[in-house]
Amino acid sequence: MTAHFPFDNSYVALPPNFFARVAPTPVAAPRLIKLNRPLAVQLGLDPDLLETPEGAEILSGNQMPETAASIAMAYAGHQFGNFVPQLGDGRAILLGEVVDRNGVRRDIQLKGAGRTPFSRMGDGRAALGPVLREYIVSEAMAALGIPTTRSLAAVLTGETVLRDPIQPGAVLTRVASSHIRVGTFQYFAARGDLASVRALADHAIARHYPEAAQAPSPYLALLEGVIGRQAELVASWMMVGFIHGVMNTDNCSVAGETIDYGPCAFMDTFDPKTVYSSIDQFGRYAYGNQPPIALWNLTRLAECLVRLLADDDDKGIEIAQTALGGFAEQFNAAYLAKLAAKLGLFTSQPDDQQLSQEFLTALAKGEADFTLAFRRLSDAAVDPSDLGEVRALFADPAAFDEWAPRWRARIATEPQDATTRQAAMRRVNPAYIPRNHRIEAVIRAAVDRDDFAPFEEILTVLANPFEEKAEFARYAEPPQPHEQVLETFCGT
């Protein structure tokens, strides 16, 4: 029986300069590592069929579903501030789109499926390590409630890829609301192709912002919609210590999802200057720089839309600048509301922002673990007089000791009872995140020993990040000094 993919493809209806038609390059011996069965069901796919050898053939790119329209998408992008007029899918091939059980259109893409016209000097392949990292982190982000691309499957290819060191090859099946990036708009704008910019904007409105079509200025509504989603997204990143690592405009999703996990990492000890990515030598994409970089990326999008916002360039620029001016307010509102909730502040008082920021200052001064400090504060919410477990996380607790009495006094003014407050705090302060040293251990077991049991276990743990279980206690702990991962790599 043939695995059925109910593709309903819309992107291929756009002009041919938007993509290149390309077939995946076959692999030697595909072997399914993991299928995301709940996601498969949500997409209207048959997980039992996908777990057969035929399913592995499809998920590796060896066989194409009948209704697939496999393409590599064209886009440009600013990489670390430098504009590259042509990038495109160099190792990813979009099989097609399905409408899921919630009526949402989703892309299904094979990452590591072989060379495309956009591959430049690359081999079009993916190594096992980065595939496992993206699978783990994207699914963890989904469980944390943060908009993200998803991972449907991971498949070994039976081949090796030339990396340093040589690694087993793998293919990731990625699912996204779309793969339209800021860089997609830049690709056409850089060529002076206003007709294609307009066609892309119309497509993005129809797919992601249908309400914008009824607005007095649909293209302004599109820009404002993307600004709002990015503000909310990056605020959510900040709440879990997530560092994307490579916030280039080609990695900025117009749909407002986290995309392209590459050298991403989660911060252990709180420090706004934290950088893990080996290619971010000057800290452009450090944890604390992510909000202004998001605005920088959105400004590049606005530049592409100026001629759609008004016939006169000066007027279009003025309209765009006004829209961009709303980012800071939207980000700050989302950020401060989320941060207050993490501290158990569910009503608003004038000094809440200062109290919240002072806790972050105490974390930095005390070199405390970001995730664990908030979680232990949640645990202490029932009896705020005993903050011993929180205090023990601080190498230097002086700033925390100064802050703690003010927090106790503030939460005493909250209307809910202590048990309700604790439950609410635990719903926003995860016990488990994909800690870098845990991911590295999973990758080493898989790459070095062909052992995927640790991979399965970490997925189980991270599927319920807010539910603490004694048997998973080690996953909540920060790394020991010898376990610390100080640098992450893109893997391309």
Curated annotation (Swiss-Prot):
ATP binds at G88, G90, R91, K111, D123, G124, R174, R181, D260. Its EC number is 2.7.7.-, 2.7.7.108. Keywords: ATP-binding, Magnesium, Manganese, Metal-binding, Nucleotide-binding, Nucleotidyltransferase, Transferase. The active site is at D250 (proton acceptor). The keyword Nucleotidyltransferase applies. Its cofactor is Mg(2+); Mn(2+). The keyword Magnesium applies. Mg(2+) binds at N251, D260. One of its GO terms (molecular function) is AMPylase activity. InterPro entries: SelO. It catalyses: L-seryl-[protein] + ATP = 3-O-(5'-adenylyl)-L-seryl-[protein] + diphosphate; L-threonyl-[protein] + ATP = 3-O-(5'-adenylyl)-L-threonyl-[protein] + diphosphate; L-tyrosyl-[protein] + ATP = O-(5'-adenylyl)-L-tyrosyl-[protein] + diphosphate; L-histidyl-[protein] + UTP = N(tele)-(5'-uridylyl)-L-histidyl-[protein] + diphosphate. Signal peptide: none annotated. Nucleotidyltransferase involved in the post-translational modification of proteins. It can catalyze the addition of adenosine monophosphate (AMP) or uridine monophosphate (UMP) to a protein, resulting in modifications known as AMPylation and UMPylation. Belongs to the SELO family. This is Protein nucleotidyltransferase YdiU.
